[in-house]
Design a protein with these regions (language model features):
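Left-handed beta-helix
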Residues: 72, 77-78, 83-84, 89-98, ...
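Serine/threonine-rich low-complexity intrinsically disordered regions
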Residues: 2-5, 18-22, 148, 159, ...
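Intrinsically disordered, low-complexity regions enriched in small/polar residues
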Residues: 5, 19, 89, 106, ...
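Conserved beta-strand-loop-alpha-helix hinge in the C-terminal portion
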Residues: 166, 171-186
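Terminal amphipathic alpha-helical/low-complexity segments used for targeting or macromolecular assembly
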Residues: 1-72, 183-192
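Glutamate identity and glutamate-enriched acidic tracts
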Residues: 5-8, 50, 98, 131, ...
């Protein structure tokens, strides 16, 4: 990841919270929004991790990042591949596998688990598309493909692939409509 890519990812994240990219808005969100502050440090640690020139700063950045992980209950690794526009509206109990892939402009609500399955026919890691809304308490694990603009309902356990623009609900998750995430995803800045 290059510096300008880091800047684009952070700008896209900030835009999801504020709806604009003014510096004052970004600074205000950094101060008042735990979700944006965490995603900023997560992306910064990921950038430092990939550049050996900056490895000397990684332990210091990691301390701040880890403190925010513990304080707000975010279990999202800085090594995870997440597109720009990550929106964390609530904190507490969000766990994402370090090898999961999450697209651009996605919402992760509280108590979401996106995990890897190490055995069985679903062995693998989830791949989440762009503009996906994942509701509170949802669980997605294994080699699951979640299509673009899908919505996963609260407490839904996803055990099979989710088509594009589908709305999943229940345990195990079933498609209940094809209205997608349009009403849940706001302030997108394109695909970063």
């Amino acid at each position: 990841m290059r510096y300008f890519e880091l800047r684009e990812l952070i700008n896209a994240d900030a835009y999801r919270y504020t709806g604009n990219n003014r510096l004052t808005s970004r600074l205000a969100q950094f101060i008042i929004s735990p979700g944006f502050r965490f995603s900023w440090w997560m992306r910064f640690c990921g950038y430092l991790h990939e550049h050996t020139v900056w490895h000397i700063l990684l332990p210091l950045a990691w301390l701040v990042y880890h403190r925010l992980q513990v304080k707000f209950g975010y279990g999202i690794s800085y090594k995870c591949k997440i597109g720009g526009g990550l929106y964390l509206p609530h904190y507490g109990g969000i766990n994402v596998s370090e090898i999961a892939h999450i697209g651009s402009n996605c919402n992760l609500s509280q108590l979401v688990t996106i995990g890897v399955s190490r055995r069985g026919e679903m062995m693998g890691v989830p791949v989440i598309g762009d503009e996906v809304y994942i509701g509170p308490g949802a669980v997605i694990f294994g080699a699951i493909q979640v299509g673009d603009r899908a919505a996963i309902g609260a407490n839904c356990v996803v055990t099979k692939d989710v088509p594009e623009s589908a709305v999943m609900a229940g345990v195990p998750g079933k498609v209940i409509s094809y209205e997608g995430s349009a009403g849940y995803i706001h302030n997108t800045l394109g695909r970063a």
